[in-house]
Amino acid sequence: MTEYTSEALYTIDEHETCLSAVRDLGTQSPDGVLFKRPLNFEWVDVTVADFLDDVYSVAKGLVANGVEVGDRVVIMSDTRYEWTVLDYAIWAAGAITVPIYPSSSTSQCEWIVGNSGAKFAIAEKSGHFTRLSTFVKDGDRPEGDTSAHLNRVLEINSGAIDILVNDGK
């Protein structure tokens, strides 16, 4: 087998993250278009500044809901703008994203939620919401308990982003 290598064109700092890269871009070019997203049957521009505002507003809502550094937060959704905002907001809050495929069965969800130790979840649709809501329990997860135990589930299609933004005010 022949192996090929080349010198790296750049280096990534030890503390550089996807979030810090977008923050840096926001400093350099806040009005640059980062996304186009559907809104009211039209495609609208989302600037770097708009995206970062969304991210930090949602991150504050996650923290207001008890999400702490190192916590795991489930996202069960197809790829969409809100998924990206939530992913970055989870990172901004110091938490860890636990993705679950939208096609996952209830038993698969139960294993992922339990195994990851996630305590908060965001679902895209009502079916996903129903599936994840079966794991909502009162109180904190007991030490050493590996069963699925969520404190809260929100649904993107029912205003999860707005709820989190309001919770963070």
Q: Can you annotate each of these PLM segments?
A:
Residues 11, 15, 44, 48, ...:
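Flexible, glycine- and charge-enriched loops at secondary-structure boundaries
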Residues 65, 92-168:
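Structural core segment of the AMP-binding/adenylate-forming
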Residues 34-88, 105-114:
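Conserved AMP-binding/adenylate-forming core of the ANL superfamily
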Residues 1-17:
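Flexible, non-catalytic linker and terminal segments flanking ANL/adenylate-forming cores
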